[in-house]
Each structure stands twice: as C-alpha cells, then as structure tokens.
C-alpha cells in the first residue's frame, strides 16, 4: 500500500497522536478509529492524509499521523469545530485513551519519497537541541543509501498548537523534536533505527518501531 508519494516543497504540518488503550476497550476503539475518526479528520480543509500505525517495539500501542498542507490547518474554524461537535462515539473513545501524546509539528528536512510500511520514530536527545535540522538533513543523506529506506523527516512540535489531550499528563511534558524514518521492511527498519540513533548520538532502544495499518488520502474522498 502506498499513499502520499512525496511531500511538496512547502512545509507541511503533521498531527502526531499516540496512545495506549485498555485491552477490553480495544475492539470498539479500533472500530471507531477505522470507521469514523480518520475520515472525519481527513475531511477537514487543509488535511491531506491520515494513517494508522501499530507498535512493533516501544512507544504507545497506537499511532495516528495526519498530514496537512501547513500548520495553518490547525488554526481554522473547521478544525476547532471538529472538537466542539464531537459525536458520542468520539467522546467515549477519546476518554478511553491511556497515556496519550499529542503533538502538532512542522515537517522539516525531508529526504526521499513514498510511504513505507514500517516507521521508526526517534525522539531526539537533549544533546541535539542546538542544530536538529542540520543533523536531520545529514542523517537522511546517509540513511538513504541503506536498502529499504523510503523517506525520512524531522517533526518539530509547535508549542502553541501542541495542546495536550484531556487525559495527557502535563507533568514534565517536553515538546521534543522527533526524527522519523520510513522503511519497506521490518529488517530495514531495524537497520535504519540503528543508523538514525548513531546519527543523533542516541540509544537505539529509545526509538519506537511502528507498522502501517492503513491510510486515507483526502483526494480519495468524494
């Protein structure tokens, strides 16, 4: 499965939402996410695509990524209305999120094109706070030579837009940039995780591995 073959030259935005869910609630949570939530979000003007991932190793179990034309999509009347007019199903399942993590980010330092079935998410260590963009560009240039590399980019959270979810803890909440690598196989993702960690002087175990479940493009909606 592929979607969104390449980011345009303008800086895109991305909504990053990761969460755990109690096992007893997972069937209805997944049904809601697949049948209602993704489509609702992707229909918002300025949203380009939405995708669901599940953890292979590390991180919260579920991850949703929503790409937008720019960060401006998160300041529109339509986006605010999506929260003010929640369905009962949405209210129920948003309350089921456990240890959620919400970030609204600028997508920077893009290398490659296409969408991989595997995702590496590396929260950057504090030592990279000085020049994350340059290091992300250099890392992408090196990693694209690895077999199975699809694309890499840096997610830079916007402090004003990254408001926490109702059940998200604000204690020690750090808006850390995240380096993301997409790969075509699990083996490639493992190798790219090691390479990404080395590029940022990070522990490979601090990176999360996810697998794509499904994706929806705004262009596919009627």
Language-model features, listed with the residues they occupy:
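Macromolecular interaction modules
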Residues: 1-222
């Amino acid at each position: 499965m592929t979607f969104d073959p390449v980011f345009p030259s303008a800086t895109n935005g991305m909504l990053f939402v990761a969460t755990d869910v109690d096992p007893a609630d997972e069937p209805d949570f997944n049904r809601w996410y697949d049948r209602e939530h993704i489509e609702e979000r992707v229909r918002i003007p300025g949203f380009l695509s939405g995708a669901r991932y599940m953890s292979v190793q590390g991180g919260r179990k579920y991850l949703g990524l929503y790409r937008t034309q720019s960060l401006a999509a998160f300041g529109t009347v339509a986006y605010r209305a999506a929260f003010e007019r929640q369905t009962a199903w949405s209210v129920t399942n948003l309350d089921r999120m456990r240890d959620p993590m919400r970030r609204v980010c600028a997508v920077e330092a893009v290398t490659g094109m296409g969408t991989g079935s595997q995702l590496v998410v590396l929260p950057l260590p504090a030592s990279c706070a000085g020049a994350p963009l340059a290091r992300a560009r250099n890392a992408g240039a090196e990693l694209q030579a690895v077999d199975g590399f699809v694309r890499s980019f840096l997610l830079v959270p916007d402090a004003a837009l990254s408001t926490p979810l109702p059940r998200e803890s604000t204690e020690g909440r750090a808006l850390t940039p995240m380096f993301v690598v997409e790969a075509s196989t699990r083996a490639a993702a493992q190798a790219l995780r090691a390479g990404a960690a080395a590029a940022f002087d990070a522990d490979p175990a601090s990176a999360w591995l996810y697998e794509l479940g499904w994706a929806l493009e705004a262009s596919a909606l009627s």
